[in-house]
Amino acid sequence: MQLNSKFARNRAEEYGFDLWGDFIIPPYFQRLELLQSNKPWVIEGGRGTGKTMLLRYLCHQTQFSASKTDYTENDFERIGIYWKMDVQFAKLMQLRGQDDYLWINAFINMGVLIITREILICLKNIRDSQYIHYAEELHNITFESLRDIDNDIPESLDDFIKYIHNKYKKFQLWVSNYSHIEEHPIFYPLIFVEELIDIIHNNVDIFKSTTFCVYIDEYENLIPTQKKIINTWIKHSQSPLIFNIAMKHNSLDIRETLGEEQIVAVHDYRAIDLDKQLDGYFKVFASEILLLKICEDIDHTILENKAWLFDVSAIKLRNDSRYKTCIINKLKKLFPSRSPKEIASDMLLDSRISARIWEDISKDLENKNSEVTIQDFMDLDASPEAYVILHALLCRKHNPKHIYDELVKYSNEEDSKFIDWIHNNLVGCILNIYGKTSRRCPLFSGFETFVLLAKDNIRHFLELCYTSLAQSQNSEVQDNLCVDIDNQVIAVKNVSQDMLYEVKQFGKEGNQLFGIALRLGTIMEQARKNDAQSEPEQTHFSISGELDEETMFILNELLKWSVLYKTKLTKQKNIEYGEEYQLNPIYSPYFLISYRKKRRMEFTNKEFRLICLGDEREFNDFLKNREKHNNIQTQQLSIF
């Protein structure tokens, strides 16, 4: 199994702007109604949900791709313009001894130049494409009426493109060397784009009703004044020029415009949450993306209906249950797994792990002066999963004889408390035992596990799959299109570590967010190490009390960058309101904690502030106090 560099691509930027033949139509595409609505869209989504790929698919480089062989008049109704902000350059347009007025006009000019350039390039590509019906009109189009704004604008399309390109280079030079260049260039107002569109409408028949939709990516990286400019454009958007934005969650922190108005949901724009749109579809959609890569790189026969992936009209066919089952089964075969009960069986066959299990049970019985001996338990020849959780049960406040009696019932297939005990404790006990023995835990393998670890992040899912395939390629154990479990577990641990350390790069607060992720993971790891497993699989938490402004800002950053995920609080002491937060499951293998959302821990607002802002001494004291508290609870815990 040989993988090439193209297989490793998991970011939109690695594909370029023309995605024809690479972009798989998402199952929610028809619901977006992007092609029908003239109201701006605010597209939100966590990292890896496909925001940039969606925008680039909607824009002219893809819709008028050289690889596309057939156009219809409908393709000309809406033309997309993609604009990803040059963040470092945009941030130069502030302060530096000048008031906001200069930099507001400078930023508007930058936007106008970029949008103009993209519209002109789109016209040129259509003119030079296989769609020749209106090539003559595009060859003959002139732009001399724009000379009312800039007298130097050339007449022809090709010369105009060069002119705008040079204007933008000179503008960049002026911004970068502002203090050394006294006179600033002519700033184009937004009406320049509107006049350009009017010329196109009046001179090329196929464009007479075209709406140009600008898609601004990574809105969250703009400074406040620049956000107000974009908000103003959104507020006043109307055909034939519509402005749309895409951003991470919690990024629409400024709603003001340059005037006294604010942008308001529904009235001024419609919000699209890609995480919600993917809900219920992620497993199959992510599988299709991976299978397309495999089809192109490894096995050309693995996708029987490849053309469906690029056809909007085939979405219904892809939603058929038989199709989805077929897709998922291919991935389950590629990334096999072991169930918790199968893993428990393997553990008792592993001499090192088995010895540790029986050693712990023996010590428990000795410490409790038990009448029941370890041999009594062994003679029952009970199922492996029962023995795996036995140490946790014996660590609780109880009589070993009661546990023995319940195990007898379970072994005889009678009604027994072991049924619930195994259900509630097996995964936590497996994790704890593998942690003690420093062995690779097979719970972190399998397609279904990859889906849970990725948590609707396509990039994370692809990285887990690619790294597993690469690990298998480098291993002595190879089987075409089937990655052995041990290779999967090695790969998952490496990906988890890489994703955790990547947090350092998450914006200007990255180092702080990384430290908080480490602290939260450490707290959950500490809970996992509790031998009694009194609260197994604690991977999410709630916060009681209101947070101060500083801590709330940090929490929002954690959510924005998907270090944490927020959901409505599940029932708590007959109260059903508030939020709870889950540490991103992709970090679970690093800390050897569960990736499942099972049990919640609770922090007070002061405790969460300490986790976010406390120094090392304060945090270590906090950990020690939690451990002491958990030990007291364990001593008091009864399993009956």
Map each language-model feature to its residues.
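Walker A/P-loop-proximal flanking segment of P-loop NTPase domains
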Residues: M1-K84, M93-G97, Y101, N105
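Conserved P-loop NTPase mechanochemical-coupling segment
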Residues: H133-F192
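The catalytic "switch" region of P-loop NTPases
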Residues: F192-T210, L222-F447, V483-L513
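The conserved phosphate-sensing helix
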Residues: A454-C465
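Long, compositionally biased intrinsically disordered regions
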Residues: Q533-F640
